[in-house]
Regions:
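Short histidine
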Residues: 103-106
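Active-site glycine/GP-rich loop and adjacent strand/helix microenvironment
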Residues: 100
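Extreme N-terminus nucleophile/cap motif
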Residues: 1-53, 67
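Acidic loop->beta-strand submotif enriched in PP2C/PPM serine/threonine phosphatases
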Residues: 75-94
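GIY-YIG nuclease catalytic motif and its immediate N-terminal context
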Residues: 56-62, 78-79, 83
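Regulatory input/activation interfaces that engage signals or partners
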Residues: 60, 64-65, 69-75
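Short, acidic, Ser/Thr-enriched surface-loop or helix-capping motifs
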Residues: 97
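Flexible, charged surface loops at secondary-structure boundaries
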Residues: 24-25, 59-63, 88-91
């Protein structure tokens, strides 16, 4: 099952977490947040390099940001960037992460 984590502003995540999670959830990584100007920032990759994941996340790993993070464990669908979270629902307005399979959408 995928892992979704919400990092509150008051929490700093340890680098070791990224190393541990990638052992089981290695089929995609992504995160989303609002920057200080209230712009939506997203990042996603299918790289299996946990240090790359942490390095992309590190600038937001402080008390200024609440961050939604998703580590994918593939159950269906290809291991491609398009199947990696967060998903854009409405550009620059709505992004989502979910657990499980959603099918039949157009």
């Amino acid at each position: 099952m995928c892992l979704i984590l919400l990092k509150p502003k008051s929490v700093i995540l340890p680098k070791k977490l990224f190393k541990n999670v990638i052992e089981k959830n290695k089929n995609g990584f992504g995160f989303m947040l609002l920057d200080k100007q209230k712009n939506i920032i997203t990042y996603k990759t299918i790289s299996k390099n946990w240090e790359e994941h942490y390095d992309a996340f590190a600038p937001y790993n402080n008390n200024d940001y609440e961050v939604g993070i998703h580590w994918r464990l593939k159950t269906q669908g290809d291991e491609i960037l398009e199947n990696t979270h967060p998903f854009e629902v409405k550009k620059d307005e709505i992004y989502m992460m979910h657990n499980g399979t959603i099918s039949g959408l157009q």
